[in-house]
Amino acid sequence: MLSILDIIEDTTVDGPGFRTSIYAAGCPNRCPGCHNPESWDINRGRWMSTDEILAKVLADNFADVTFSGGDPMYQPEGFTELARAIKRQSRKKVARTSGAIQDILLRLCYVTHYRPNYCSMSMYW
């Protein structure tokens, strides 16, 4: 189960092309200037199963996926499971933004691209 603030379909602001953006609840980083401070509290989200989220992602044949938030890696097992399920069942590209520690991410994920940024990291599965 993952705590999710929102799922936005067919957005063009969270990565290249059309995306399904999944906004995670919960973030320990408290970055200065955060554009989603309401996402810091994990209890503000709605608990959703990986299968429930996966169905929404796979329903759009054209959009790739962005994990945002909050910090998706505040819930590393769930988002890693979701990323792997998306890759197993589709050709979608999955991007993620996070301020989480790099070596944790590299151990958990099949990373094909890594681009660090101040208090934010983008990673593609």
Q: What positions do the PLM features span?
A:
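Conserved Radical SAM active-site core
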Residues: 2-5, 18, 36-95, 99-108
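Short loop/turn motifs at secondary-structure junctions
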Residues: 30, 61-62, 113
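N-terminal pre-triad scaffold of radical SAM enzymes
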Residues: 3-30
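Acidic side chains
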Residues: 10, 14, 71, 121-123
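Radical SAM/AdoMet-radical enzyme domain recognition
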Residues: 97, 104-125
